[in-house]
Each structure stands twice: as C-alpha cells, then as structure tokens.
C-alpha cells in the first residue's frame, strides 16, 4: 500500500548537506514522473530534495533534519495521510516530532 502525497522543501541546501529520508518506497521526478531513486528504510538520500523543488512521495514518510533546516508541507490535489517529520537537535539526540496535515486517504496497491 502506497500513499500519494506532496512535500515542498523551499530552503537553501549546501551542496554537501544531506537529507535523510526514512521511508520504504520511491521518489518520482516532478517533471516527467520518472523514478528518481529507489530507497529502503533508513537510507540516506543525496541530492533528491532540492531547494524550492517539488517531489512526489509515494508512501508515508519521516524526515530527520538538522535544526537549521525548515520544511513546509503543502496540500496538493492528491489525497494523503498524516506525514510525520522529526527535526533532530544533534545526530545523537532525539528530536521533536512535527506532524503534517492529516486527511482521510485513498490508497492504491503497487
């Protein structure tokens, strides 16, 4: 079961910075729908989510971000369930949980 959803990441990202996406599924290119990267749970993704760019998230996910980052969840025309993000104070410490918009979802089996 995969859930359709969108997330906007409109901040400046240093070239060597990492965004760790904790999910099981894949990301699709927002322009032509081609698969950008296939990842498993806990993998660190390089250069997938770029400043001010849209990506399509084909499942429920979590983020782990440095405290200097900000993220914005945006509602789109596809239904999605609650998207949960965690902003980490330090890599060795737990962070606060931030919840995105919750909607009733329509899921499709892939």
UniProtKB/Swiss-Prot annotation:
Disordered: region residues: 85-110
Bias-annotated ranges (Polar residues): 101-110
Superkingdom in the source lineage: Eukaryota
Record's miscellaneous remark: Partially overlaps CDC15.
Listed name of the protein: Putative uncharacterized protein YAR019W-A
């Amino acid at each position: 079961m995969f859930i359709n959803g969108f997330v906007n990441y409109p901040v400046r990202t240093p070239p060597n910075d990492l965004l760790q996406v904790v999910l099981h599924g894949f990301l699709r290119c927002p322009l032509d729908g081609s698969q950008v990267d296939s990842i498993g749970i806990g993998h660190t993704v390089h250069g997938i989510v770029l400043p001010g760019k849209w990506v399509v998230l084909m499942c429920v996910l979590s983020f782990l971000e440095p405290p200097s980052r900000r993220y914005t969840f945006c509602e789109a025309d596809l239904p999605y369930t609650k998207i949960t993000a965690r902003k980490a104070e330090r890599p060795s410490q737990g962070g606060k949980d931030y919840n995105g918009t919750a909607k009733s979802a329509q899921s499709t089996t892939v």
